[in-house]
Amino acid sequence: MRFLMGLRAQLPGPAPYRLLDIGTGGGRHMLLAGELGFAPFGVDISFTGLSHARKRMQQTNLMASVAAASMTSLPFADSSFHAVVSYGSFYYGSAQVMRQAIAEAYRVLAQGGKSFVVLRSTDDDRFGKGRELGLNTFELGICGTNELGTVQHFLAAEDIPEYFSQFSAVNFEKAEWTTGGRTRLNSDWLITAEK
Protein backbone atom coordinates (compact mmCIF):
# COMPACT_ATOMS: atom_id res chain seq x y z
CA MET A 1 0.00 0.00 0.00
CA ARG A 2 1.54 3.23 -1.25
CA PHE A 3 0.37 5.25 1.78
CA LEU A 4 2.07 2.98 4.33
CA MET A 5 5.36 2.86 2.45
CA GLY A 6 5.40 6.64 1.98
CA LEU A 7 4.48 7.29 5.61
CA ARG A 8 7.13 4.94 6.95
CA ALA A 9 9.78 6.69 4.84
CA GLN A 10 8.82 10.01 6.50
CA LEU A 11 9.12 8.75 10.08
CA PRO A 12 12.50 8.97 11.79
CA GLY A 13 14.32 5.97 13.17
CA PRO A 14 13.27 2.43 14.01
CA ALA A 15 10.77 3.32 16.75
CA PRO A 16 7.66 1.11 16.68
CA TYR A 17 5.06 3.55 15.41
CA ARG A 18 1.53 2.48 16.33
CA LEU A 19 -0.87 1.96 13.43
CA LEU A 20 -4.59 1.18 13.64
CA ASP A 21 -6.34 -0.67 10.81
CA ILE A 22 -10.10 -0.04 11.15
CA GLY A 23 -12.10 -2.77 9.44
CA THR A 24 -9.03 -5.00 9.26
CA GLY A 25 -10.88 -8.08 7.99
CA GLY A 26 -8.23 -10.75 7.37
CA GLY A 27 -5.42 -8.38 8.36
CA ARG A 28 -3.66 -7.83 5.02
CA HIS A 29 -2.84 -4.18 5.78
CA MET A 30 -1.63 -5.13 9.26
CA LEU A 31 0.83 -7.57 7.68
CA LEU A 32 2.32 -4.90 5.43
CA ALA A 33 2.40 -2.42 8.31
CA GLY A 34 4.28 -4.94 10.45
CA GLU A 35 6.77 -5.63 7.67
CA LEU A 36 7.41 -1.88 7.43
CA GLY A 37 8.17 -1.62 11.15
CA PHE A 38 4.85 -0.39 12.49
CA ALA A 39 3.27 -1.87 15.62
CA PRO A 40 -0.11 -2.79 14.07
CA PHE A 41 -3.48 -3.00 15.76
CA GLY A 42 -6.63 -4.08 13.95
CA VAL A 43 -10.33 -3.83 14.73
CA ASP A 44 -13.34 -5.28 12.96
CA ILE A 45 -16.90 -6.31 13.77
CA SER A 46 -16.46 -9.62 11.93
CA PHE A 47 -15.36 -12.43 14.22
CA THR A 48 -14.59 -14.53 11.13
CA GLY A 49 -12.33 -11.80 9.75
CA LEU A 50 -10.59 -11.40 13.11
CA SER A 51 -10.03 -15.16 13.31
CA HIS A 52 -8.35 -15.09 9.88
CA ALA A 53 -6.26 -12.08 10.92
CA ARG A 54 -5.07 -13.84 14.08
CA LYS A 55 -4.08 -16.92 12.07
CA ARG A 56 -2.15 -14.79 9.57
CA MET A 57 -0.31 -13.01 12.37
CA GLN A 58 0.63 -16.36 13.98
CA GLN A 59 1.78 -17.83 10.65
CA THR A 60 4.06 -14.86 10.01
CA ASN A 61 5.15 -14.40 13.65
CA LEU A 62 3.99 -10.79 13.49
CA MET A 63 3.42 -9.11 16.82
CA ALA A 64 0.02 -7.51 16.31
CA SER A 65 -3.19 -7.08 18.25
CA VAL A 66 -6.73 -7.50 16.96
CA ALA A 67 -10.01 -6.81 18.70
CA ALA A 68 -13.72 -6.81 18.00
CA ALA A 69 -14.86 -3.20 17.87
CA SER A 70 -17.14 -0.90 15.94
CA MET A 71 -15.58 1.83 13.80
CA THR A 72 -17.93 4.30 15.53
CA SER A 73 -16.78 3.43 19.07
CA LEU A 74 -13.09 2.54 19.20
CA PRO A 75 -11.75 1.10 22.49
CA PHE A 76 -8.62 3.27 22.54
CA ALA A 77 -7.57 6.43 24.34
CA ASP A 78 -7.33 9.74 22.52
CA SER A 79 -4.15 10.25 20.45
CA SER A 80 -3.12 6.57 20.69
CA PHE A 81 -1.85 6.03 17.13
CA HIS A 82 0.67 7.56 14.73
CA ALA A 83 -1.34 6.33 11.73
CA VAL A 84 -4.88 5.13 11.03
CA VAL A 85 -5.99 3.28 7.90
CA SER A 86 -9.39 2.11 6.77
CA TYR A 87 -9.75 0.49 3.39
CA GLY A 88 -13.38 0.25 2.37
CA SER A 89 -15.16 0.18 5.73
CA PHE A 90 -16.39 3.70 6.47
CA TYR A 91 -18.89 3.75 3.60
CA TYR A 92 -20.92 0.87 5.05
CA GLY A 93 -23.78 2.67 6.76
CA SER A 94 -25.44 6.06 6.70
CA ALA A 95 -23.87 9.50 6.43
CA GLN A 96 -24.04 9.72 10.22
CA VAL A 97 -22.15 6.42 10.60
CA MET A 98 -19.46 7.65 8.21
CA ARG A 99 -19.11 10.93 10.11
CA GLN A 100 -18.84 9.07 13.43
CA ALA A 101 -16.19 6.72 12.02
CA ILE A 102 -14.14 9.65 10.68
CA ALA A 103 -14.48 11.44 14.04
CA GLU A 104 -13.28 8.32 15.89
CA ALA A 105 -10.29 7.97 13.55
CA TYR A 106 -9.44 11.60 14.27
CA ARG A 107 -9.85 11.12 18.03
CA VAL A 108 -7.43 8.18 18.29
CA LEU A 109 -4.86 9.75 15.94
CA ALA A 110 -1.92 11.54 17.60
CA GLN A 111 -1.22 15.18 16.78
CA GLY A 112 0.69 15.22 13.48
CA GLY A 113 -0.48 11.67 12.74
CA LYS A 114 -1.77 10.67 9.32
CA SER A 115 -4.74 8.68 8.14
CA PHE A 116 -5.61 6.93 4.89
CA VAL A 117 -9.27 6.19 4.15
CA VAL A 118 -10.93 4.68 1.07
CA LEU A 119 -14.52 5.82 0.45
CA ARG A 120 -16.98 5.22 -2.38
CA SER A 121 -17.53 7.89 -5.02
CA THR A 122 -20.92 8.90 -6.38
CA ASP A 123 -19.49 7.84 -9.78
CA ASP A 124 -19.40 4.20 -8.65
CA ASP A 125 -21.82 1.90 -10.49
CA ARG A 126 -23.43 0.92 -7.17
CA PHE A 127 -24.61 4.50 -6.62
CA GLY A 128 -28.40 4.68 -6.94
CA LYS A 129 -28.82 0.90 -7.27
CA GLY A 130 -31.31 0.17 -4.54
CA ARG A 131 -33.61 1.81 -2.06
CA GLU A 132 -32.65 5.41 -1.26
CA LEU A 133 -32.38 5.98 2.49
CA GLY A 134 -31.06 9.53 2.40
CA LEU A 135 -28.86 11.82 0.37
CA ASN A 136 -26.25 9.60 -1.36
CA THR A 137 -27.20 6.63 0.86
CA PHE A 138 -28.72 3.42 -0.50
CA GLU A 139 -29.65 -0.06 0.62
CA LEU A 140 -28.10 -1.88 -2.31
CA GLY A 141 -30.34 -4.04 -4.44
CA ILE A 142 -27.69 -5.59 -6.67
CA CYS A 143 -28.33 -9.33 -6.91
CA GLY A 144 -25.46 -11.74 -7.35
CA THR A 145 -23.05 -9.83 -5.12
CA ASN A 146 -22.09 -10.08 -1.48
CA GLU A 147 -23.30 -6.49 -1.04
CA LEU A 148 -27.01 -7.17 -1.59
CA GLY A 149 -28.93 -5.47 1.21
CA THR A 150 -25.96 -3.54 2.58
CA VAL A 151 -26.37 0.15 3.35
CA GLN A 152 -23.70 2.30 1.71
CA HIS A 153 -23.00 6.02 1.71
CA PHE A 154 -21.28 7.63 -1.30
CA LEU A 155 -19.39 10.93 -1.51
CA ALA A 156 -18.96 13.51 -4.26
CA ALA A 157 -15.67 15.44 -4.41
CA GLU A 158 -17.26 18.52 -2.87
CA ASP A 159 -18.35 16.48 0.20
CA ILE A 160 -14.86 15.42 1.25
CA PRO A 161 -13.58 18.71 2.76
CA GLU A 162 -16.66 18.92 5.00
CA TYR A 163 -16.47 15.30 6.18
CA PHE A 164 -12.77 15.73 7.04
CA SER A 165 -12.99 19.33 8.30
CA GLN A 166 -11.43 18.56 11.69
CA PHE A 167 -8.14 17.50 10.03
CA SER A 168 -5.43 20.09 9.36
CA ALA A 169 -4.60 18.84 5.85
CA VAL A 170 -6.67 16.70 3.47
CA ASN A 171 -5.73 15.36 0.04
CA PHE A 172 -7.77 13.08 -2.15
CA GLU A 173 -7.72 11.43 -5.54
CA LYS A 174 -10.08 9.14 -7.38
CA ALA A 175 -9.22 5.54 -8.29
CA GLU A 176 -11.40 3.81 -10.89
CA TRP A 177 -11.38 0.39 -12.51
CA THR A 178 -13.88 -1.95 -14.14
CA THR A 179 -15.04 -5.44 -13.21
CA GLY A 180 -17.66 -7.83 -14.51
CA GLY A 181 -16.25 -8.06 -18.02
CA ARG A 182 -15.54 -4.30 -18.02
CA THR A 183 -19.20 -3.47 -17.52
CA ARG A 184 -19.14 -2.30 -13.89
CA LEU A 185 -17.23 0.80 -12.78
CA ASN A 186 -15.69 0.83 -9.32
CA SER A 187 -14.96 4.39 -8.21
CA ASP A 188 -13.29 5.12 -4.88
CA TRP A 189 -11.83 8.16 -3.15
CA LEU A 190 -8.31 7.67 -1.74
CA ILE A 191 -8.11 10.19 1.09
CA THR A 192 -5.07 11.12 3.16
CA ALA A 193 -5.54 13.44 6.10
CA GLU A 194 -3.27 14.80 8.81
CA LYS A 195 -4.26 15.76 12.35
Predicted regions and their residues:
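A short beta-strand submotif of the Rossmann-like class I SAM-dependent methyltransferase core
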Residues: S86-S89
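Class I (Rossmann-like) S-adenosyl-L-methionine-dependent methyltransferase catalytic domain
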Residues: M1-L19, G25-S73, F116-K195
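Surface-exposed loop/turn positions
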Residues: Y17, S80, G112-G113
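A short glycine-rich, Lys/Arg-flanked "PGG" loop and its adjoining helix->strand segment in the class I
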Residues: R99-Q111
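A short His-aromatic
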Residues: Y91-G93
